[in-house]
Amino acid sequence: MSQSGSVLRRNGFTFKQFFVAHDRCAMKVGTDGILLGAWAPVADVKRILDIGTGSGLLALMLAQRTDDNVPIDAVELDAGAAMQAQENVAHSPWPHRITVHTDDIQRWAPRQTVRFDLIISNPPYYEPGVECATPQREQARYTATLDHQTLLAIAADCITEDGFFCVVLPEQIGNAFTQQALNMGWHLRLRTDVAENEARLPHRVLLAFSPQAGECFSDRLVIRGSDQHYSESYTALTQAFYLFMWGVNGERIDGPDSASCCG
């Protein structure tokens, strides 16, 4: 991103309240994860599950957004990424709330005796095909180790009756994921289509499903205005995390604690 709202270091990102190192993770901190972590509904949440936590970004963002008594379980298959997530959590303000599990979610989930009000995932979405540079990156990007039907089934087994399961996906894949979820008995409750600017078609979609039927709220989020500054809606959604941003009028937007950062 140009005019990045977080401070980019060679090995990670510094946000307002925490630092995310990602040099040992196949998938780096990016706009998709930041959008999902800032967007997911957290009202009245009592327990959170992050499937495929990677660097721990989503778990850390949700810890910042929720009460201090809300525990977060973050499951990661890759041992290197899980270790880095554990280190990021240990250096954050919430080491007592976030537990990183180095495990396959397909093995971990059946052992759980509690259910989760919020389940969140930035899942792999490419079908197996062209090889990636490393097995770790292939695991993070491709659905071979966790296909969408399996992910939806695991979430269904772990969620509370009125909980939300939230994902971010490319637009077309998100549409197919939604149909698959509906066929499995999920109900789409929130949908935000994300476009880079007003002139472009949406390229990402944020989705929230629930076992419970109800009205579906849909909207559109544009990241940048015609002047290439962040839009008002994107700024409102993410400014609790970014150290600074540039608003629609070109002003720098600082948070109250932007001078103090972790890492």
UniProtKB/Swiss-Prot annotation:
It is found in: Cytoplasm. InterPro entries: DNA_methylase_N6_adenine_CS, SAM-dependent_MTases_sf, Small_mtfrase_dom, tRNA_Adenine-N(6)_MTase, tRNA_adenine-N6_MeTrfase. GO terms for molecular function: nucleic acid binding; tRNA (adenine-N6)-methyltransferase activity. It is an enzyme of class 2 (transferase). Its EC number is 2.1.1.223. One of its GO terms (cellular component) is cytoplasm. GO terms for biological process: methylation; tRNA processing. It comes from the Bacteria. Its main location: cytoplasm. Keywords: Cytoplasm, Methyltransferase, S-adenosyl-L-methionine, Transferase, tRNA processing. It catalyses: adenosine(37) in tRNA1(Val) + S-adenosyl-L-methionine = N(6)-methyladenosine(37) in tRNA1(Val) + S-adenosyl-L-homocysteine + H(+). Pfam families: MTS (PF05175). Specifically methylates the adenine in position 37 of tRNA(1)(Val) (anticodon cmo5UAC). Belongs to the methyltransferase superfamily. tRNA (adenine-N(6)-)-methyltransferase family. NCBIfam families: tRm6a37MtseTrmN. This is tRNA1(Val) (adenine(37)-N6)-methyltransferase. The gene is yfiC.
